[in-house]
Amino acid sequence: MATNGHFAPIGSDSSDKTTYEHGVQVIDENKEFNTNLTKYLTFENVTPAGFNYHLISVFGSQSTGKSTLLNHLFGTHFSVMAETERRQTTKGIWLSKNKNGDGKSMADNILVMDVEGTDGRERGEDQDFERKSALFALATSEVLIVNIWEHQVGLYQGANMGLLKTVFEVNLQLFLKDKNTTHRSLLFFVIRDFVGTTPLKALQKTLMEDMSRLWDSISKPPGLERSTVHDYFDFQFYGLPHKSYQPEKFVEETKKLSLRFREGQKNATLNAQNGEFSEGGVFLPEYHRRIPADGFSVYAEGIWDQIVNNKDLDLPTQQELLAQFRCDEILREVMVAFDEAIFPFEDKQSQASRLGEPEVLGGLGAAMRSARAKATKNFETEASRYHKGVYQRKRAELEGKVDTRLKALFQGQLNAAHKSGINDFSDAVTAEVKAGQKKGTGYDFAEIVNDEVKKALQKYEEVARATVVEGAPWSNYQQELALYEKELSEVSARLRRDEMRRLATRVERWVQSRLGESVGLEFNALGSGRAGGAAPESGEKPSEKKFWDRVWNLFVETVLDAERRFTDRASSFDASLEEVDVGLWRLRRKSWGVLRAKIEEEMTEGNLLLKLRENFEDKFRYDEAGVPRIWRPTDDIEGIYTRARESTLTLIPLLSRFRLAETSAPPPLDRWVGHTPSSATTADEEDLPPIGGVDEEEGKSLEEEMTILGDAKRQELTIRFKKAADGVYVEAKRSAIGGMTQVPLYFYGILLALGWNEIVAVLRNPAYFFLLFVCAVGAYVTYQLNLWGPILKMTEAASNQAMIEGKRRLREFLETSDTGRQAIAMSSSGSSRSGNEHEMSRLNKQGKSSTDEDVDDL
């Protein structure tokens, strides 16, 4: 007996291809299914064939030459029985691929199953395996070859009529489970040892009569009582000569028979009931079980599991389970390739999100489109062969998984483009504004914003279009584009507000500078009481009475000028009327704050007291023509002092309250500032200081807002001013009294009498006279040039330097000469006896010691 060499039996885990060279054991004699069937199909390159494969099973009694027939027909190497023995050879079910196919004469990928023979003594009465193997073969095979000898035709047991009856019953069982599909199969009777004495037609007729009887004998479900065997089975017949007696003819006929195993088409003109049977290709489309090759192993295992556990065989359910299993496998495989393509982008996007730095990923759109197309195409190619309902459901699941991740990437890309676009837009506008400011030629803010908005939208749409996945329902960015445009508008408005704030700040600084200068000049003018001869006798000049009028007019004119500047510049920002109104309202409030701060600065106690004193001194020390007064005892010092003091004192109540001379009331600040614009926001108001009489919540009236000095301050300021004025008056009084001390006239007569000789000597001597004349001219020129002060200082400095130099030389002389050293020694010995002696080095120019000088300073 030849054994199944290079066949993979049950329990073999070898991955060596040589183990599967001749085939694989599908089911062993113990009803165990071989899970390595997939490996064999992979090694034989059947797995990727899809539906392009065919499965044949052979039935027959034990030791009737089934394996021999298959080996000659398909070039397989199934074990055959030795001619010297009569025993079981094939145990279980074995499978091998056709080795004779050349791609032309036979169909591709023919798989042949050698089923254990029936009626064997090894199993005896146990027919359970026969029934289960028949059911398995019928559920999986397109063609069932029934191998019988010619002399067995007409017998019941010898012709395997019992097994065929089982096949018919099983087929009806399968039909009841799936009434939508007619499971049609071909029963191919190969009559062995055919000698031709009985014509093949007669044998066909006998067998068909037996088939009809068997069919009629089985119990049928309601509705199928009138059905015939031809409704579910097709039949073909072929006779083969005796292998031992006619070996050459046997080989020749098997070659002819092998040519029948190709794809064919049903011939509708043949009537099987009249004994007309096809002699063409045996593989008709309706025979195929429509199980893809890559799922056959799983399907066969599921079928056998139900059969071996005596469960009702439900092929539709098994097909759905197979489709579920294979579609899940294919989906996982497809997702692995999808992950490889997409995960790097997901990782980059996730990292950028964690870092808070949005990044537009280059090449994302192409990768997404390619990954999605490949995933759906690969899944469709592999899974579309399976159960349509399961396939469509799993395809939807795949698309859902793929689209969920791609949608997240798409949204992330749009978000990154959104955020980076907003940042770039803001930076670009800021940079353009700064560039315009540096050039100093001015810039059109609205034009800058419009240009940058166009660039930002164009860039965003480029990114979005590049990321779009055609056919994906989520791949529409119009809503995101609208949100992007909206935020660009909001950012533009914010940048415009910021720019207007900066403009307002610049205008406010300009107002502050102008008001600081002009109002400062008005306050400085208060320090001068000189007005020329036109000054009235009372000293109350109109200019002082209208001081606040001038300040208010200056303030209003300055702010109006600033408002014109602000309005002209804001027009280039494309600002709305509401924004301009808010800006002008803020400018007026800020300007009032600037004026009030300047007034408070000028009205500090020290500054105001100084201005009052200067005002008083100008009125007191200068006459009506502005000429300085030289006080004489005959002058009315008290009257002038009183008038100047009272005139200056009138400034204190004048300055204490901001009132207009024309109306004797505070300026209309509330009307001038105006009401808060309706478009003003909280942010517009939060940095504005409250104004009394304008802001109700401030709780201050306009009168209180215009009060510069309180009563206590006025009283204190009046007292201090009077004290300062009294000091000036006392000084003037002393000056007038000091002028009364004069040299007696007789002194000049005595001086003339006693110095007459010297005067005559000088006048008579030309040299003396000329020297006197030169000295007089020099003294006059020095006086006119006001050089007596510098000359005296230079003289004093020269004398001090001469004194220091003299002391130094004297010290050197005393230290270097013998006499000097003796004198120093004597001075040192006597210093303890006299505390009044001093070192010369400690004498100053007045001859005092430094100690005496320190006492004088105290």
Curated annotation (Swiss-Prot):
Question: Recorded GO terms, molecular function?
Answer: GTP binding; GTPase activity
Would you tell me the Gene Ontology cellular component terms?
endoplasmic reticulum; endoplasmic reticulum membrane
PANTHER family in the record: PROTEIN SEY1
Role: Cooperates with the reticulon proteins and tubule-shaping DP1 family proteins to generate and maintain the structure of the tubular endoplasmic reticulum network. Has GTPase activity, which is required for its function in ER organization.
What is the organism field in this record?
Emericella nidulans (strain FGSC A4 / ATCC 38163 / CBS 112.46 / NRRL 194 / M139) (Aspergillus nidulans)
Show the taxonomic lineage. Answer: Eukaryota, Fungi, Dikarya, Ascomycota, Pezizomycotina
Q: Which InterPro entries match?
A: G_GB1_RHD3_dom, P-loop_NTPase, RHD3/Sey1, Sey1/RHD3-like_3HB
Q: What is this protein called?
A: Protein sey1
Q: Is-annotated flag, keyword Coiled coil?
A: yes
